[in-house]
Curated annotation (Swiss-Prot):
Species of origin: Methylobacillus flagellatus (strain ATCC 51484 / DSM 6875 / VKM B-1610 / KT)
Pathway(s) served: Glycan biosynthesis; glycogen biosynthesis
Family designation: Belongs to the bacterial/plant glucose-1-phosphate adenylyltransferase family.
GO BP terms: glycogen biosynthetic process
Protein known as: Glucose-1-phosphate adenylyltransferase
Gene (name only): glgC
Record flagged with keyword Methyltransferase: no
Length: 427
């Protein structure tokens, strides 16, 4: 094909129609601490009304990839419920679907042992689709990306595998798979979470990091997964095992996120790994800016989610003693701010903030009830918590440390369990 044909919209559409996406959503996300005690990280709420997994799912839909499998394992009930309620709008008669693929010992009597094994254990389902390409995605990152452009680059390079990548600060690179590439962006070196990562040749302060987004030729992927499954020394992980093996023998290319990111302003791209409480809080706080880097209001690339039927947000009382108001904040449906002041905060659905309370730089998850005369500063409150009248959190961190979790940046995480409120009755 000619170069212009390899980038045409019709060609990209053909590629996306011949692709199945697998979203790996079985991780616990232990660095999010108590936020993932009862749910998998991809199901954690984000941005006022979404869940983290809505971003890769929406990227698939908006890119034209309409055959999607979601691989689940750890405490998947909330995630399964969300997908069943909010992602059933695809048309099966057009061979479109979002299917749940829980760990079910389909091939062997073990649960998913690694990212590659999670795909391997669903190999029979993949083969039945008769597709040309497999797009493998992490289910726990926040970003907007046109996967069609990555698929086109994969075909253009005649690649066996393509790895999406971004530049990250060198001091943070140990948390990622770090790669080295030649002048044609062919991957020549790869190390998963190195203790001493290598910098970019032309930028000593940054490293080239894998985003955990891969494109494979389908038949090639099946061969490699079988080979890896038969290797007793393998940990069955794409970053630790599959990629280091492939770069020695096959055509593995890097795809720069800047070539396919959506809605980037002034050449800046938006991609967030919200894997820690600090990163999660900061990413939510960024959304309260007048012009945030992540545009949730872009009708050309919407973020889809489950639309719960809720009444409008409501603000009541307007006098000197108590005034219901919110500034520089995201307030979701079903919220009532009753004679309280909310600033630079994100309130998810069905939150109640009662009179004389003050909320600043805080993330309040769904169905939280905040009493009267409460003060919250730089706090993340987990779903369903009830904050008693008069409680101050984020004002005296030494006192907070005795009851709650305090992050390195001084953000306070509060959950119902920490408040002695048992929402998960087992006995």
């Amino acid at each position: 094909m000619q170069q212009h044909e390899l980038s045409s919209s019709r060609f990209v559409s053909t590629l996306t129609k011949n692709t199945v996406a697998l979203i790996l959503a079985g991780g616990k996300g232990s660095r999010l601490r108590d936020l993932t005690n009862w749910t998998a990280k991809p199901a954690v709420p984000f941005g006022g009304k979404f869940r983290i997994i809505d971003f890769p799912l929406s990227n698939c839909i908006n890119s034209g990839v309409r055959r999607i499998g979601v691989v689940t394992q750890y405490k998947a009930h909330t995630l399964i419920q969300h997908i069943q309620r909010g992602w059933g709008f695809l048309r099966g008669e057009f061979n479109e679907f979002v299917e749940l693929l829980p760990a079910q010992q389909r091939i062997q009597e073990e649960w998913y042992k690694g990212t590659a094994d999670a795909v391997f254990q669903n190999l029979d389902i993949l083969r039945q689709t008769n597709i040309e390409f497999v797009l493998i995605l992490a289910g726990d990152h926040v970003y907007k990306m046109d996967y069609g452009q990555m698929l086109a680059a994969h075909v253009r390079n005649k690649a066996d595998m393509t790895v999406a990548c971004i530049n990250v600060p060198l001091k943070e690179a140990s948390a990622f798979g770090v790669m080295g590439v030649d002048e044609n962006d062919r991957v020549v070196d790869f190390e998963e979470k190195p203790a001493h990562p290598s910098s970019l040749p032309d930028d000593p302060d940054h490293a080239l990091a894998s985003m955990g987004i891969y494109v494979f030729n389908a038949a090639f992927l099946y061969e490699q997964l079988i080979r890896d499954a038969d290797d007793p020394k393998s940990s069955h992980d794409f970053g630790h095992d599959i990629i280091p093996y492939l770069i020695k023998k096959y055509r593995v290319f890097a795809h720069r996120f800047t070539d396919s990111c959506v809605g980037a302003a002034d050449g800046n791209y938006y991609w967030r790994d919200v894997g820690t409480v600090d990163a999660y809080w900061e990413a939510n706080m960024e959304l309260t800016k007048v012009v945030p880097e992540l545009n949730l209001y872009d009708r050309q690339w919407p973020i889809w989610t489950y639309q719960e039927q809720l009444p409008p947000a409501k603000f009541v009382f307007d006098n000197e003693e108590r005034r219901g108001q919110a500034t520089d904040s995201l307030i979701s449906g079903g919220c009532i701010v009753s004679g309280a002041n909310v600033r630079n905060s994100v309130l998810f659905s069905d939150v109640r903030v009662n009179s004389y309370s003050s909320i600043e730089q805080s993330v309040i998850l769904p169905k939280v009830d905040i009493g009267r005369h409460v003060t919250l500063r730089r706090v993340v409150v987990d779903s369903g918590a009830r904050i008693p009248d008069g409680m101050e959190i984020g004002v005296n961190l030494e006192l907070d440390r005795k009851r709650f979790h305090i992050t390195e940046q001084g953000v306070v995480l509060v959950t119902p369990d920490m408040l002695g409120q048992n929402l998960h009755h087992i006995r």
